[in-house]
Structure formats: structure tokens, C-alpha cells
């Protein structure tokens, strides 16, 4: 990834960075909750974004 990025690419990377986090613990505590973990987590070395 180059140090000179377009704004569009930068926005895209920022969104992916925000998506790549675990679910909050209070969501797991909710009644009737079936979500255990964030299944859409992405590891930087294993799965690339396809840019």
C-alpha cells in the first residue's frame, strides 16, 4: 500500500478497520442472544481486502 492514497481508498480502509473488531460484551449479555463472536473478523495476513 502506497503512502499516497486517494481519499476514496482511505475511506474504504477506514471502514474496514472499524468493521474489524470484536462484538461488545453487553451485546452478548442481552436476553435471547445467539451471537457469540464477530464471524466477519479479518486478519491482515490471512485474508486480503482485494484492493
From Swiss-Prot:
SUPFAM superfamilies: Ribosomal protein L39e. Keywords: Ribonucleoprotein, Ribosomal protein. GO terms for cellular component: cytosolic large ribosomal subunit. GO terms for molecular function: structural constituent of ribosome. GO terms for biological process: translation. The keyword Ribonucleoprotein applies. InterPro entries: Ribosomal_eL39, Ribosomal_eL39_dom_sf. Belongs to the eukaryotic ribosomal protein eL39 family. This is Putative ribosomal protein eL39-like 5. It comes from Homo sapiens.
